[in-house]
A protein has these predicted regions:
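Short beta-strand/loop segment that forms part of the nucleotide-sugar
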Residues: 107-120, 141-144
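Short, acidic, metal-binding catalytic loop of nucleotide-sugar glycosyltransferases
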Residues: 79-87, 91-109
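A solvent-exposed, charged loop/short amphipathic helix patch at secondary-structure junctions
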Residues: 62-90
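C-terminal catalytic/acceptor-binding lobe
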Residues: 243, 254-322
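Conserved catalytic core of nucleotide-sugar-dependent glycosyltransferases
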Residues: 173, 180-182, 189-264
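Membrane-proximal basic amphipathic "stem/tether" segments
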Residues: 1-42, 322
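Hydrophobic targeting segments
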Residues: 59-63, 95, 111-115
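Active-site-proximal specificity loops/subdomain of glycosyltransferases
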Residues: 121-178
Length: 322
């Protein structure tokens, strides 16, 4: 009789909760397990389930890498004060771990990664190639010449290269992206669960809102320096908050990239104040969210308002991604 009742309940879209034994008989799981059904339902206790209508099919990751410049446009040193190549290695290593964990859960999901390299010396580039040799990564060189007639003359070669690599990453997203596109910089170290949580939370929240959204993986300190109102949303495993500013690490859909191509393009034609001026304009019309707490750590100077997320064990995440 119990089995028949469970089948009938599931037929009508319900799951059974046995709070006495702390299990779900219909899902055959304990209640502190992941109760969600991939691409079908996102289940968070005690809020029930969300039917997934925004299903993620593929993810294109585009990582901008510069293993030589310590901190662009600054003379300050990063946390731990190591050569820049050490940050690039740890960033990519953490990304590889996150991709593998995500693929274990979302085996149907196509994940491809393109690395845009900006003039790394051979010694550094060889280290990166060794790191990714068995992964679905492609390294391409930044085409400086292509953008000399497009980007306005800048005060420094570093600024020009930064704008050029950003424009090349946006163009690759436009030409090669199919579903979700994730723009990443090589001074972020990611938690292993980062991608899996971003995908599952994207599906849940976008399905609830019935629209595409933009996600930033980092909980920046500057988000707490102004008395700005925000909305708190429930993701798959943590809270997310609405934000109206990001840096250049964010994930969005191909449809949103096409819709706001002019904003992305104008960001790269000249240096603006703030740098992300035209990107931030997008968030006046679209929902952008970041996690509470952070899924990725921006390793800048310890005093930077654009860097270290609060309540993170910085040394642990650094040491575990050598």
């Amino acid at each position: 009789m119990k089995k028949i009742f469970i089948k009938i309940a599931r037929l009508f879209g319900y799951e059974i909760i046995d709070q006495n034994n702390f299990v779900s008989p219909s899902l055959n799981k304990e209640l502190n397990d992941d109760l969600s059904i991939i691409n079908e339902r996102s289940i968070v206790l005690p809020l029930g389930n969300v039917d997934i209508t925004k299903k993620v099919r593929s993810l294109l990751i585009i990582l901008r890498m510069n293993t030589e410049v310590e901190i662009w446009d600054q003379k300050k040193k990063r946390l731990f004060e190591q050569p820049k190549i050490e940050y690039s290695i740890r960033s990519i290593n953490s990304l590889i771990k996150s991709i593998k964990l995500c693929k274990n859960k979302y085996s149907h999901l196509s994940i491809n990664t393109v690395v845009i390299d900006d003039n790394s010396k051979k010694e550094n580039l060889d280290k990166i190639k060794d790191l990714i040799q068995n992964e679905n990564f492609e390294i391409i060189s930044l085409d400086h010449e292509k953008y000399k007639s497009i980007i306005k003359k800048q005060k420094s070669a570093e600024t020009f290269s930064n704008l050029a690599s950003l424009l090349q990453s946006f163009e690759i997203g436009k030409n090669q992206g199919d579903d979700l596109i994730f723009f990443i910089e090589d001074d972020y170290i990611h938690y292993e669960t980062m991608l899996e949580e971003m995908i599952s939370s994207y599906e849940r929240i976008a399905s609830q809102l019935k629209k595409d959204l933009i996600m930033c993986p980092s909980d920046y300190p500057y988000l707490y320096m102004n008395n700005e109102k925000t909305n708190i949303l429930i993701g798959s495993k943590r809270h997310w908050r609405t934000i109206n500013k990001t840096l250049c690490t964010f994930m969005l859909s191909k449809d949103l990239l096409n819709k706001y191509w002019e904003n992305l393009y104008k960001t790269c034609i000249d240096r603006h104040d703030p740098f992300e001026k035209y990107i931030n304009e997008i968030y006046l019309s679209e929902v952008c969210i970041s996690p509470l707490k952070s899924l990725s750590l921006h390793l800048t100077n310890i005093n930077s308002s654009y860097g270290l997320s609060p309540f993170i064990d910085y040394k642990k995440i650094w040491e575990t991604n050598k």
